[in-house]
Structure formats: C-alpha cells, structure tokens
C-alpha cells in the first residue's frame, strides 16, 4: 500500500484524500489543518489522523473535540508521498520540509512550474513522471485544456489553439472574495498564464489564451477554437471525445446550457460533492468550419485535478508504469464513468 499524506485538507486536499482512500493500492496516513474547522471535524468522521503545523494550537483542537496525532513533521515520517493542498504560493515554502523528510511530493497548479520542475497530466506525460521525487499537477483550467488538446492532437494534429477562459469568481464556500457585480479581466494583457502553463505539459502546442473572472462560483467555462492539420467531420471529433475516459459530453437531450444546470445534474447523478471530474463539453457547441474546431467546455475548479493527483501518485511511486492502467484503476475505484 502506498502511504499518502495530505498537507492542507481544504478544497482540493479533502477531495484527494477521499479519492486516495477509494483506491485499492493506497491509504491516507494523515491530513493536516492549521486550525479547528468544519473540514477538520469531517476529517475526524472519515477516520483521517489530523496533524498540525503549529503544536501550540493543539489545545484549541482539543477544545473543539479534534484529536491531534502530531506535527506535520511527524506525519511526513510515516508517508511515502505527500500531496500539498495548501493555498497557492504557500506550497513552495514547504519544499524544504519535504526535502528534509526525504518524501516525494505533489504540488497543485497554484504553484509555479519551477517548484517541481515537472508539470503533470495523466493522459499527456504519465510515463515521464515515473519515479520522480517532485511533481506539480497543473491547474483545473490547464488540466481541462491538456486533456482535450492532447486527444485532438493525437487524432488529427493541431496547428494552433485559441481559447477564452471565463473563470468563476470564487469557490462556493468562499465569502470574502468576488467580484459581486463586475466582469474582471484577469489579466487585461494577453496571453493569460493558461497557455504557457499548457506548454509545460505540451510544449509543441501553439496556444494563446485570454481570461476573465465573472460573478459565479459554479465552474469555469472555456470557449475554444482549435485549427486542425486536416479537415475532419463533426462526427469524427465527437467520436474522439466520446472515447476519452475523462471527457464528458453534455448531451442536447438534457437541455442543459449553463454551469448551474450542469452542477445540479451531476449532483442528481449522486457524485460525491457534486463533483465533475471530467471535462464537460457541450455537445451542441461542437462544430467544424473548414479545419477549425469550435466548442464550449465547463471545468469544475474544485474537482477535475483530483483524479490527476491519484495518477501522479502511482506514476511517482513507479509500481504502475502504464498510464491507461492507472487511469482505469483510478476511475473504477471511484465508480466514475465520464458523461
């Protein structure tokens, strides 16, 4: 069994913890929190040992009825690998801690590529991650882009990608962040960081991205144009999308045309936390004009990287060397079939 620690049991960390726990070849040996919270109480209910960075706060946890198993350093001693789920920019400061502990580590897309020197997507570069000590799983938006660009490039060849990212303003539980009544260019300059981030995984792709933030919490939306190397039919493209085990098609018969309706649909399906782990491509939007492919896709910012973290763990530990085998193991353990 691969022994996994979660440093930062928040939006991503708690989801990765549950995903890891569902796997037959992994176990959670501990999670970390900085202060008592509802999430910490849920971790206790789930049976995850809780570790803290500042042992002077142990009494505060005790008063909240949350047992503390030890320090983060204690947790790392028991782990084969740690998934860093701390807020963007914080994870980099933990690198020295992981190096000292001699533990493998995975960071999230909020950190720069340089923190690990390798950025990961299971379908694109799993084999290159085998045996690595440090890996960064790219962000939710970049994950969604990499999945579909890689699939289309393998099938037809890609000349260039142009994409507009309409990003949610905050996660649903966040009350101190906006905007409330504005569309914010983020950044106002072009390109946004998403294109260069795709190039950390798919360096040969010509891609330019633009991004804005809007007053919603339920997923990002991408408007994507891909110029292909040859003319293909819409049916050819849809066949590639349907065959991908982490790309889902939102079918016209559902009458879904918004992220809110899609989130509700996924919740009604019984997904944990109403998580959309796959790309949600709106089938009606898929269109070919000459060699240009157009479509919209919804990306659930809290969820799509979770399954990528599980595959990154397997790759780094080196016991499963075939990407499709790991992807299948992850999906099946989570009872996940793409839309």
Curated annotation (Swiss-Prot):
Pfam families: DapB_N, Gp_dh_C. Pathway: Carbohydrate degradation; glycolysis; pyruvate from D-glyceraldehyde 3-phosphate: step 1/5. GO terms for molecular function: 4-hydroxy-tetrahydrodipicolinate reductase; glyceraldehyde-3-phosphate dehydrogenase (NAD+) (phosphorylating) activity; glyceraldehyde-3-phosphate dehydrogenase (NADP+) (phosphorylating) activity; NAD binding; NADP binding. GO terms for cellular component: cytoplasm. Its EC number is 1.2.1.59. The active site is at 140 (nucleophile). NAD(+) binds at residues 11-12, 110, 168, 301. D-glyceraldehyde 3-phosphate binds at residues 139-141, 194-195. Keywords: Cytoplasm, Glycolysis, NAD, NADP, Oxidoreductase. The keyword Transmembrane does not apply. It catalyses: D-glyceraldehyde 3-phosphate + phosphate + NADP(+) = (2R)-3-phospho-glyceroyl phosphate + NADPH + H(+); D-glyceraldehyde 3-phosphate + phosphate + NAD(+) = (2R)-3-phospho-glyceroyl phosphate + NADH + H(+). InterPro entries: DapB_N, GlycerAld/Erythrose_P_DH, GlycerAld_3-P_DH_AS, GlycerAld_3-P_DH_cat, GlycerAld_3-P_DH_NAD(P)-bd, Glyceraldehyde-3-P_DH_2_arc, NAD(P)-bd_dom_sf. GO terms for biological process: glycolytic process; lysine biosynthetic process via diaminopimelate. It is found in: Cytoplasm. Belongs to the glyceraldehyde-3-phosphate dehydrogenase family. HAMAP family: G3P_dehdrog_arch. Homotetramer. This is Glyceraldehyde-3-phosphate dehydrogenase. It comes from Methanospirillum hungatei JF-1 (strain ATCC 27890 / DSM 864 / NBRC 100397 / JF-1). The gene is gap.
